[in-house]
Amino acid sequence: MPNPVIHQPEHHRFVIIEDGAQALLEYRMLAPDVIDFVHTRTPAALRGRGLAAQLVVAGVGHAREQGWRVIGSCSYVAAWLEKHAG
C-alpha cells in the first residue's frame, strides 16, 4: 500500500513520513503557473521503497491539476518527466 503523501505548501514541499523519517520533494514557484521541483531527498533507511517516485507522482499530479507548467531542476524529477512524457 502506498504511503500517504502530505503536501506542505507553507514549506514548498511534499513529504512522506515513515518510521519517524521524512522523504521529501521540494519545489519553488517561478511564476503563478510555473512550478520547479528542485530537490528530492530520501533518507538511507527509507531508500529502495519507491518513495521518491511516489512523491514525484503526487507533486506532478498536483501541478497538472492546477494547470501549471512543470520544470524539473532536480535530476531525479527531470529523468522521471522524460520517462513519463506524453
Whereabouts are the PLM-identified features?
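Conserved acetyl-CoA-binding loop-helix of GNAT-fold acetyltransferases
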Residues: 48-59
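Short, surface-exposed charged micro-motifs
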Residues: 4, 24-27
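Conserved GNAT acetyl-CoA-binding A-motif
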Residues: 60-75
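A conserved beta-turn-beta hairpin within the catalytic core of GNAT-like acetyltransferases
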Residues: 29-38, 69-71
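Conserved beta-hairpin
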Residues: 12-22
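Active-site rim helix/loop that mediates acceptor-substrate recognition in acyltransferases
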Residues: 1-13
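A short, internal acetyl-CoA/4′-phosphopantetheine-binding micro-motif in the GNAT/acyltransferase core
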Residues: 40-47
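Glycine-rich phosphate/pyrophosphate-binding loop shared by adenosine-nucleotide-utilizing enzymes
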Residues: 21-25, 35
